[in-house]
């Protein structure tokens, strides 16, 4: 759907979830998408990836700031804080979640960049909402988690 779609329009489509992907520029420049996420959280599972991650973070009250040196290229090491495992993923972003702004938002940081410690993924402790700053491979566990959230949503509808 276009960036200026309303929550009512999205809900009328009767989809099982909302996937918000990448795009150019500063996430602070698209408040309409931030509002859309705020309006839909709790009504359907949401997965934000790359720019979508930044928008999910803003929608939950965290800050997203411009990085001094962005992450670009392949094979960036990322630590999964739940498992302790190191994953590798391509990245291309100049903005990041401000880790100091997460407290009190209901977000929990789940992955960090091994090289500089910046947050790379988060999930809501309140809503069925997930997000990742890095490009997810086709079999990444976050997709499976998102699918499970959508299945649970259908059972509880």
What kind of feature is each model-predicted range?
Residues 7-14, 103:
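Short amphipathic alpha-helix with an adjacent loop that forms part of the alpha/beta core around
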Residues 84-127:
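Catalytic beta-strand/loop cores that center a nucleophilic Ser/Cys/Thr
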Residues 128-132:
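Catalytic His-Asp charge-relay segment
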Residues 19-21, 123, 133:
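Structural motif
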């Amino acid at each position: 759907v276009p960036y200026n779609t309303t929550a009512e329009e999205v809900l009328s489509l009767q989809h099982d979830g909302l996937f918000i992907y990448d795009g150019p520029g500063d996430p602070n420049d698209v408040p309409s998408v931030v509002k859309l996420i705020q309006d839909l959280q709790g009504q359907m599972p949401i997965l934000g990836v790359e720019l979508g991650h930044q928008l999910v973070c803003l929608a939950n009250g965290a800050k997203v700031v411009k990085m001094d040196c962005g992450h670009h290229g392949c094979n960036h090491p990322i630590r999964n804080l739940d498992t302790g495992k190191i994953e590798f993923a391509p990245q291309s972003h100049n903005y990041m979640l401000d880790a100091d702004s997460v407290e009190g938002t209901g977000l929990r940081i789940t992955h960090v960049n091994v090289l500089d410690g910046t947050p790379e993924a988060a999930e809501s402790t309140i809503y069925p909402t997930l997000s990742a700053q890095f490009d997810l491979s086709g079999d990444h566990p976050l997709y499976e988690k998102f699918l499970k959230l959508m299945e649970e949503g259908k059972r509880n509808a």
